[in-house]
A protein has these predicted regions:
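Extended ligand-binding regions for polar small-molecule ligands
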Residues: 11, 16-18, 64-65, 82-164, ...
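A ligand-binding cleft/hinge motif common to bilobed small-molecule-binding domains
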Residues: 23-30, 51-52, 56-80
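Alpha-helical segments with a strong preference for the paired helices of cellulosomal dockerin domains
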Residues: 45, 52-54, 212
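Bilobed "Venus flytrap"/periplasmic-binding protein-like clamshell domains
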Residues: 1-47, 63
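Conserved small/polar residues in nucleotide/adenosyl-binding loops
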Residues: 203-210
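Short beta-strand->loop
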Residues: 36, 71-86, 96
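Detector for small/aliphatic-rich hydrophobic stretches
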Residues: 178-183, 187, 197
Length: 212
């Protein structure tokens, strides 16, 4: 089997009450196929039911499928089919009402995405402090924002080298992705739709100046 279009008549373990349940129904209907639903309450229950043979396939967010497969006794005996039947971006979340912390979390991620766009990595970030690109210099805390006399960190309650420290210690978005969940890890996820907009895909970030 190499495609979800071959799943007519399959039994599917699916977590009830989720958007995945609705997306699956739409996909099968749009492709003129039928399926037998095997309802479960949690991802762990879906894993157990699938491994016990209660269903032919198991569906959830793609990242969840890859993570589950990595924990199976023999991951190579299972495949994640290539079709992406819906696009539901996942990202960091914080407690409601803590807007300052939400800004820090949001811009920490954005800084890593901008760094990838600019070609800034954990290995060249010191060299990039000598860049001629104004946005790179502001991101790394070398230059201030206009005539404010302040760096981006001031609007987040952080030092101006906050983004530099993230990139130096963690890397840009690509480095972090490839290190923790990329194709050379047990989870083995390709960038796919998580690639940058300049590669004709989804990821980009606003400028920190939008925050100032």
């Amino acid at each position: 089997m190499s495609s979800a279009t071959e799943l007519d008549g399959a039994s599917v373990c699916i977590q009830v009450g989720t958007t995945t349940e609705m997306n699956l129904a739409d996909y099968f209907k749009a492709n003129g196929m039928s399926y037998e639903s095997v309802p479960v309450e949690t991802n762990s229950e879906a894993d157990a039911a699938y491994l016990a043979g209660r269903c032919d396939i198991y569906t959830t967010d793609a990242s969840g499928l890859y993570a589950s497969r990595a924990g199976y006794p023999d991951p190579s005996a299972h495949i994640v089919l290539p079709e992406i039947i819906s696009k539901e971006p996942l990202g960091p979340s914080v407690r409601h009402g803590d807007s300052e912390w939400a800004d820090i979390v949001r811009w920490s991620l954005n800084a890593m995405i901008i760094a990838e766009e600019k070609g800034i990595t954990s290995t060249n970030v010191d060299e990039m402090k000598n860049s001629k690109d104004p946005e790179t210099l502001r991101l790394l805390g070398v230059s201030k924002v206009g005539d404010t006399g302040k760096g981006y960190g001031a609007w987040l309650g952080l030092d101006d080298d906050w983004a530099y420290n993230i990139i130096k210690q963690v890397g840009n978005y690509s480095e972090s992705f490839e290190k923790h969940i990329g194709v050379n890890t047990p989870i083995n996820i390709a960038r796919g739709l998580n690639a940058l907009y300049k590669d004709c895909l989804l990821y980009t970030s606003p400028s920190p100046r939008d925050k100032c």
